[in-house]
Design a protein with these regions (language model features):
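A generic structural signal for ordered alpha-helices
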Residues: 6, 37, 158-162
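Hydrophobic single-pass membrane-insertion segments
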Residues: 16-29
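Exposed beta-strand-loop-beta-strand "reactive/processing" segments of non-cytosolic proteins
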Residues: 61-140, 193-225
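Short, non-transmembrane alpha-helical segments in secretory-pathway proteins
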Residues: 34-86, 167-195
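Intrinsic disorder/low-complexity detector
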Residues: 5, 26, 30, 35-40
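Long, charged/polar, surface-exposed segments that mediate recognition or autoinhibition
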Residues: 117-194
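Hydrophobic membrane-insertion alpha-helices, especially the h-region
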Residues: 3-19
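Functionally engaged cysteine thiol sites
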Residues: 1, 175, 221
Length: 225
């Protein structure tokens, strides 16, 4: 009787957490099972005026100690260099940053000659988007298939399994998006538009959808000829 009652109470507690605190439930689930669920935390600063360059350090810290940047993509940047992550239009503003964490080879890693040569990394994706949005994930974990839900508090963290790979790592972005926008405005970009800005090993690629506006910058913020 006590076992049944305890099980019932645990079940009711889990159900309540799933409704009122899904992120806490997924965190508990991760600790118990070892399966890494998507995590979430608030963005740095005002989500309605989110500056991904100014907030970059918080994204890197969320990715994990030693995380190295692979790329950064900001969708729908306003002329002042910020995104309104609370905007209700679709598709909505979003920042995606890809990182890599160097890790030790897993216990079941193949030997050299069977695909085991190279450095092992875990790829980490940090996304900043509209707070309050709920996500649902179905995946296969160490103990079998799992399904869970989470609520975005401002940015999310998703980590892949270890794998060997080769990356070109980037320094932290230093070109203010407002400065890139100023160059685009001088070249005729509409001031009431929003831009997509991508940062990778070739520099910054500034584009405005729907109109023929594209400006490319090097990593020193200078326009490429």
């Amino acid at each position: 009787m006590l076992i049944i009652t305890a099980a019932t109470l645990i079940g009711l507690g889990a159900a309540a957490l799933a409704v009122f605190a899904p992120n806490l439930l997924t965190s508990i689930f991760s600790r118990v099972t070892g399966y890494e669920t998507i995590q979430s935390r608030p963005v740095q600063g005002d989500p309605a005026n989110y500056d991904p360059v100014a907030a970059y350090a918080s994204m890197q810290a969320f990715a994990g100690e030693g995380a190295q940047l692979i790329s950064l993509d900001a969708q729908f940047v306003r002329p002042d260099g910020t995104l309104d992550l609370t905007a209700s239009y679709t598709p909505s503003p979003r920042v995606s940053a890809e990182f890599a964490l160097e890790v030790a080879p897993p216990a079941d890693a193949p030997p050299i000659g069977a695909g085991g040569l190279g450095t092992w990394y875990r790829r980490v994706t940090i996304q900043a988007y509209r707070p309050g949005q709920q996500g649902r994930v179905s995946s296969r974990g160490p103990g079998g298939s799992v399904t869970y839900t989470y609520v975005n508090q401002g940015m999310t963290r998703d980590i892949d399994d270890p794998a060997t790979d080769t990356f070109t790592f980037l320094p932290a972005p230093t070109c203010a998006f407002a400065d890139l926008w100023q160059v685009a405005l001088e070249r005729g970009a509409p001031a009431n538009a929003v831009a997509t800005i991508e940062y990778d090993d070739e520099g910054y690629d500034f584009r405005i959808r729907d109109v023929n506006v594209r400006v490319q910058f090097d990593s020193a913020c200078q326009v490429k000829d």
